[in-house]
Amino acid sequence: MESALTNATSQTNFTTIDWVIVVVYLLLSVGIAFFVKRYAGNMTNFVSAGRAVGTWLGIATLTGTEMGLITVMYSAQKGFTSGFAAFHIGVIAGIVAFLIGVTGFIVVRLREHEVLTIPEYYEKRFGRRTRILGGIMLAFGGLLNMGLFLKVGAMFIVGITGMVPDSVAVNTVMVVLLALVLVYTVIGGMISVVITDYIQFVILSVGILVTGWLAIDFVGWDNLFKTVRTYKGEAGFNPVAAESGFGWEYVGWMFFLGIVNCALWPTAVARALAMESTTALKRQYTWSSISFAIRMIIPNLLGICAFVFVMNKAPDLQAVFFPEEADVKAVDNLYAMPIFLGRILPAGLIGLITAAMIAAFMSTHDGYLLCWSTVITQDIIAPLFKERLDNPTRIKITRILIVLIGLYILYWGLFYTGEEDIWDYMAVTGAIYFTGAFSLLFGGLYWHRASSTGAVLALMAGITAVIGLGPVQQAVHNWIPGSIAEQTITATYEKTIEFEAFKEPDEVEESPVRDMVVDFVMTPFEQAKPWRFNGLKSWTAVVQNAAGQTQAVEIRTSDPDAVTVSAWPEDFEPQVGDTVSIYKPLSGARVGLMTIGFTLFVFILGSLIFPDRKQKEATNE
């Protein structure tokens, strides 16, 4: 499969002239950072560009940061796997951004407080301990959230340029990209970020529109709908269709994420706090609602075009991404869009598009690196020193943290093994921070009875969102309600393992109170019925051998005394005497919605039971 992928990426139109275009652009970006270094002399200028960003530059820099290469890649991945049904994510994002622009929900009141970061507001409203804890939760969730950005960006460059898609190439590209981003973010701060964001906004806007037009022209507009209908049916168009992989639960989760992206996520809020006035801020969000939708819909379309191309015009790619043999692992579908573009775009233009995508990559990374390093400096380190740090020291600490965070995302990209779609991974890791942050900002700004104890409890409750990650669920699966405890394996052959047969339990005498409690607790979970044929289909089996090694695999079919899995890894084979436990994975959307409800509950309850002795006004400045 590795050789097949190498052959697939090698058929690119990327040439020497394209490399020249990319290098010239990168040198221009670094040059800008050196030029504006003189203007980054204090923390306000370094972090928020002196709070002097106008409406149209604000729109450009907000779009530049929020439409990074990671956005293009995860949106294309959703289009490739889900078809036109994925459009609902972008449509919802645009609608929510427009409503926030019209109402000023959360962001206007934050701007009126003239804070540099969200945790700084926590201190004004709830006290120093809340600010420090909020900064820790924000940094923890945010760093996990951006952990795969670097690897995904490297995969795009490897796929579109025709490099050998092995770990050496991906890792080398990761190091080079990280070095470039670190140089101009460390040197210039937010001023260089805003200026490069503007340039990248222009290049990326033109590049993504031209690419979309060429992609549709190549595969044919009619073929788009026909192919999606043929292979995906109604699920390729309707996000609430049975087989779409989304559903109403996911749609509701997307509405909340729309609020998060605009009003809670620090990189977007940092742009709001840099605006020259609240009027400019509201205008920024109102107009940016268009880009909030387009930034996902056009990459969705590129992913759909890649799917149509693979299924109709590239049998070699079809064998790579959709192998017929059940025991052959499909290649990561993140490669689909860049390989597709590498084959259809002409030399010269492909260099411009790649430069635009790298621009998007750098735009996101500079904003995120600056944001998280600022949070750690301003909201964790500075409060611990009781504000005794002067501006030069804070800037120096921030620059050191930018480098350390860069090294962390390099490490995380190399070693994280989760199999979630990138968008779903980002939503879950971000929820560690934003589920608690929503309670604190909404309650703190609009509810005068919100207390510091309730705030601390809500922030701590947000950590439960980490259960949405696949590796974490696997580690704690025995604690998930409805799961099946360890069973001893009595026989194995090929992809099937046998154990003692499950029997349907006898009916228990009805108890209205007990039934009500059980129904309430089990509502988010699925109760196992292993005595039925295929009662465990699509569940996950976790096999543990005598050495303590575990392996999780999806169940394809099940009987009362056996399960058949999709495939065993080459280096793992279950034996008689090993144990198997079984659980139903929780979707990221379900975990996210559960965490939102949980954090709001503990915030309200904590505020009512433990009110502050001296209440602060919700609009306190």
Where are these regions (language model features)?
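Membrane-embedded helix-loop-helix hairpins and adjacent transmembrane boundary segments
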Residues: 1-562, 569-621
